[in-house]
């Protein structure tokens, strides 16, 4: 894996621990795993209750099926995209998450009537360079760098594309509000900060404001510091009595290090209530650690992505291990990417937030995702009507 070259955002990857806390933070290094600790403060019962109430109020919105909020002004998509071409270079075509987004973007292109090229590759930077060169030679309208390609690794090619009048956009890589590479013409950002805050809110409520929590970041992912900082900040606000430990296991080390490190943390901190990886696919290496420690029903997993196999674990275990997972409709994400990129192609103002909604999956509603769970199932279909109307489509 080329972790140093890729800003990963896919179903088997994602966050970092470089944050410091305003309370008391201790950092050390054990076996190459960075560890930080946020100590609980002496919070009064009223402060704890206030935090729980605030967390509950923030969670409530995300227990309802998503509704559509227009991210920007309406426009005539077919007029703007006539004779236009979008060339998408995904981080790795073999990843199910990435290919689902590509398929959704291709469906939008077919509906609107413009050409969409999905540049298949296996995650090699050399292939990304070749894709950029092909896009430039074909004089496309916009190049989409999807789901984690670091723009810095393609700086010469991006400059050449822009010199040729081609716009270059990074999609589903940066979090909303996170600074992006200025070499880009635009971005389509993901709600990474909000997902992190929701995880903190959930663990606050379900630990009665006194949780002992292990966060797991992955330092080879660009959005990691952003998400971890958001989660730490939320705990400080809603759970002053919580004790939060944070370790870093790079994606490249997930298979070899996660179980060992989680087992070590369970032994070092026997009162742990939650293990919370920023990306839910890491749970496949966490569940064995919880099982080996005989902590099923005592230590739960809370995470983000709504990955089908993780929701399947939730169904099988009835929430006894994976308790909650923040999900997003990948069809909605595809439509959001297409929306902002069409705006950029047409010279319209880009939108900073595509209003991609989130939805909380738990044991009470997870069967709505299908048995077995499927991408895009259980979220409703408000996005199709909403975006089609926004784009001036009558049929």
Where are these regions (language model features)?
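Structural motif
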Residues: 71-72, 116-139, 247-268, 283-285
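Hydrophobic alpha-helical segments within soluble ligand-binding/sensing domains
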Residues: 128, 186-213, 225-226, 258-259, ...
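An alpha-beta-alpha
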Residues: 86-87, 105, 195-248, 341-374
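Hydrophobic alpha-helical
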Residues: 147-162, 231, 250-313
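Flexible loop/hinge segments that line or gate small-molecule binding clefts
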Residues: 151-152, 156-194, 212, 307-319
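Extracytoplasmic "Venus flytrap"
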Residues: 43-104, 108, 117-129, 134, ...
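Hinge/cleft segment of the Venus flytrap/periplasmic-binding protein
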Residues: 43-84, 329-395
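Periplasmic-binding protein-like
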Residues: 139-148, 167-171, 214-215, 246-247, ...
């Amino acid at each position: 894996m080329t972790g140093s070259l890729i800003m990963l955002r896919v179903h088997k990857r994602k966050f970092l621990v470089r944050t410091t806390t305003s309370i008391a933070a201790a950092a050390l290094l054990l076996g190459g795993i960075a560890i930080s600790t946020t100590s609980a403060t002496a919070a009064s019962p009223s402060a704890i209750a206030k935090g729980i109430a605030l967390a509950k109020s923030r969670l409530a919105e995300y227990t309802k099926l998503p509704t559509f909020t227009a991210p920007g002004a309406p426009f005539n998509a077919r007029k703007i995209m006539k004779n236009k071409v979008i060339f998408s270079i995904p981080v790795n075509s073999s990843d199910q998450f990435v290919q689902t987004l590509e398929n959704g973007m291709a469906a939008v292109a077919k509906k609107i009537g413009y050409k969409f090229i999905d540049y298949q590759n296996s995650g090699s930077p050399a292939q990304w360079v070749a894709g950029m060169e092909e896009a430039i030679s074909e004089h496309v309208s916009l190049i989409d760098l999807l789901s984690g390609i670091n723009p810095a690794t393609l700086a010469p090619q991006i400059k050449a594309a822009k010199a040729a009048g081609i716009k270059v956009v990074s999609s589903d890589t940066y979090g909303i509000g996170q600074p992006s590479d200025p070499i880009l013409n635009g971005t389509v950002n993901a709600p990474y900060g909000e997902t992190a805050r929701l995880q903190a809110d959930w663990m606050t409520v379900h630990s009665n404001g006194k949780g002992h929590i292990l966060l797991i970041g992955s330092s080879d992912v660009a959005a990691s510091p952003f998400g971890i900082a958001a989660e730490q900040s939320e705990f400080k606000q809603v759970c002053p009595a919580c004790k939060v430990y944070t370790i870093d296991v790079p994606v490249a080390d997930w298979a070899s290090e996660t179980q060992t490190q989680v087992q070590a943390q369970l032994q070092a901190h026997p009162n742990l209530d939650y293990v919370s990886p920023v990306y839910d696919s890491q749970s496949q290496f966490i569940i064995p650690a919880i099982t080996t420690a005989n902590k099923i029903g005592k230590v739960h997993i809370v995470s983000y992505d709504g990955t089908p196999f993780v929701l399947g674990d939730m169904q099988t275990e009835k929430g006894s291990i994976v308790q909650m997972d923040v999900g997003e409709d990948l069809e909605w994400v595809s439509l959001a990417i297409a929306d902002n990129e069409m705006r950029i192609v047409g010279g319209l103002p880009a939108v900073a937030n595509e209003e991609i909604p989130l939805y909380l999956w738990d044991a009470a509603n997870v069967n709505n995702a299908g048995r077995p769970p499927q991408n895009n199932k259980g979220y409703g279909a408000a996005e199709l009507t909403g975006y089609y109307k926004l784009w001036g489509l009558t049929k």
